[in-house]
Amino acid sequence: MTTVSINKPNLLKFKHVKSFQPQEKDCGPVTSLNFDDNGQFLLTSSSNDTMQLYSATNCKFLDTIASKKYGCHSAIFTHAQNECIYSSTMKNFDIKYLNLETNQYLRYFSGHGALVNDLKMNPVNDTFLSSSYDESVRLWDLKISKPQVIIPSLVPNCIAYDPSGLVFALGNPENFEIGLYNLKKIQEGPFLIIKINDATFSQWNKLEFSNNGKYLLVGSSIGKHLIFDAFTGQQLFELIGTRAFPMREFLDSGSACFTPDGEFVLGTDYDGRIAIWNHSDSISNKVLRPQGFIPCVSHETCPRSIAFNPKYSMFVTADETVDFYVYDE
């Protein structure tokens, strides 16, 4: 697996190389995608209460992990390649801490009273955030089964850590606000509130800081995404030019993502194509259309979720199938 410079010509050279069909008959759409820190493995969760583990570097399926008793969503690696946490979709809505090699649970994180819609691991330590339909966002430590901090929230939030692990963002789609919090001063509330002045911007499904710490992406499934200055909160760009996805009952982990250098955004399209936006060379406060598209796998495939490998020149899309794209000269 190679690593190449990220630019428009190279992004257009990414090609689809592998497609994985569901392993079970009662298959359902993939609801989350996550790479480990080293970019060697990919973990997905599906609406049929299973998780799938892949070798990202070899584009190879490795294993299915069943969670039929509890259901699963938002499966993410900890900082150990053989461990993950994921949210339950039934029973008691505990967050599970699982060893992927032994299939043994290491800990249950109890407290949420409704579905957990989002989980994010702190990039520099073993704490993580969860957002739930029980009107709370919670901060946890992998070593302790009870939450460290509970933040009241009237609606399920999108959540994201900045690269330093010192700041996190909570996105509230009901009041069109994003709050930025200092982890050391959570109880003081957000130190910056970003207002989104677009009442049509709905169906949020992603918050993501760029790896260079400069930008904050707010993704949606309506064919539009927004980029903000991560320091000032100023809206910089509106990304358009893709078709909206129809509403569905299942969650997903976001239809847009930054490239690892933070200079481009890739987004999925209901047409099946992958859109490329270049915001780094653009004048701020502009509406941007895609500079190009990576061809779709087939006209029958409409991937909702997308994730770029943090270390290697490859990305993955998913919905009914999991599709690997790699750089190809």
UniProtKB/Swiss-Prot annotation:
Pfam families: WD40. This is COMPASS component SWD2. The COMPASS (Set1C) complex specifically mono-, di- and trimethylates histone H3 to form H3K4me1/2/3, which subsequently plays a role in telomere length maintenance and transcription elongation regulation. Involved in mediating RNA polymerase II termination. Component of the cleavage and polyadenylation factor (CPF) complex, which plays a key role in polyadenylation-dependent pre-mRNA 3'-end formation and cooperates with cleavage factors including the CFIA complex and NAB4/CFIB. Component of the APT complex, which may be involved in polyadenylation-independent transcript 3'-end formation. Its main location: nucleus. Keywords: Chromosome, mRNA processing, Nucleus, Repeat, Telomere, WD repeat. Component of the Set1C/COMPASS complex which consists of SET1(2), BRE2(2), SPP1(2), SDC1(1), SHG1(1), SWD1(1), SWD2(1), and SWD3(1). Component of the cleavage and polyadenylation factor (CPF) complex, which is composed of PTI1, SYC1, SSU72, GLC7, MPE1, REF2, PFS2, PTA1, YSH1/BRR5, SWD2, CFT2/YDH1, YTH1, CFT1/YHH1, FIP1 and PAP1. Component of the APT complex, which is a subcomplex of CPF, and is composed of PTI1, SYC1, SSU72, GLC7, REF2, PTA1 and SWD2. It comes from Saccharomyces cerevisiae (strain ATCC 204508 / S288c). It is found in: Nucleus; Chromosome, Telomere. InterPro entries: Swd2/WDR82, WD40/YVTN_repeat-like_dom_sf, WD40_repeat_dom_sf, WD40_rpt. GO terms for biological process: mRNA 3'-end processing; sno(s)RNA 3'-end processing; subtelomeric heterochromatin formation; telomere maintenance; termination of RNA polymerase II transcription, poly(A)-coupled. Transmembrane segments: none annotated. Belongs to the WD repeat SWD2 family. WD repeats lie at residues 25-64, 111-150, 152-191, 199-238, 246-287, 298-328. Present with 704 molecules/cell in log phase SD medium. One of its GO terms (molecular function) is chromatin binding. GO terms for cellular component: chromosome, telomeric region; mRNA cleavage and polyadenylation specificity factor complex; nucleus; Set1C/COMPASS complex. It comes from the Eukaryota.
